[in-house]
């Protein structure tokens, strides 16, 4: 079979499926729920990564130059993310209403999709294991030649409370 991969803005995924511009989509929440809601019974979730035992952390990457020249701005950015996470956890319903106003989902669906995620700032042993697990999979597929020691490439200095 001939498969063509096409990058789309996540906000366009549901409409692309509904208009048959694409035959399948891969995306994180809330875009999967949004697609299921718009397309109804014409689409089917074939699988998701929720049972893999991985946190799939979102990693922030910065150059040495950026760390030296804009370290304070990075610290402020991370502090803002930390405050946002605290707000989400302390006032879930209001936070989901705010998110839903930007994603186009109902508050209920936004809450469902967001409920699959962790809202914390940090990097712990579970995250290291998650990245290592993904790296081992890529190694098995021969997409990479070796697995690095993850913590050799992680700098925790800029995290709040570190």
Regions found by a protein language model. Give the residues of each.
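Short secondary-structure boundary/hinge segments and terminal tails
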Residues: 35, 53-55, 117-118, 150, ...
């Amino acid at each position: 079979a001939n498969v063509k991969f096409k990058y789309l803005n996540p906000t366009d995924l549901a409409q692309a499926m509904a208009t048959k511009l694409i035959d399948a989509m891969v995306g994180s929440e809330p875009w999967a729920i949004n697609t299921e809601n718009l397309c109804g019974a014409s689409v089917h979730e074939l699988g998701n990564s929720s049972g893999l035992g991985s946190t799939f952390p979102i990693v922030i990457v910065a150059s040495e130059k950026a760390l030296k020249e804009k370290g304070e701005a990075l610290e402020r950015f991370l502090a803002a993310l930390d405050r946002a996470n605290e707000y989400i956890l302390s006032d879930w319903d209001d936070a989901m209403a705010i998110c839903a106003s930007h994603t186009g989902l109902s508050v209920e669906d936004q809450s469902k999709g967001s409920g699959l995620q962790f809202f914390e700032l940090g990097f712990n042993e579970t995250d290291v294991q998650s990245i290592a697990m993904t790296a081992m999979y890529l190694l098995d597929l021969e997409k990479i030649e070796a697995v690095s020691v993850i913590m050799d490439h992680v700098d925790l200095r800029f995290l709040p409370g570190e």
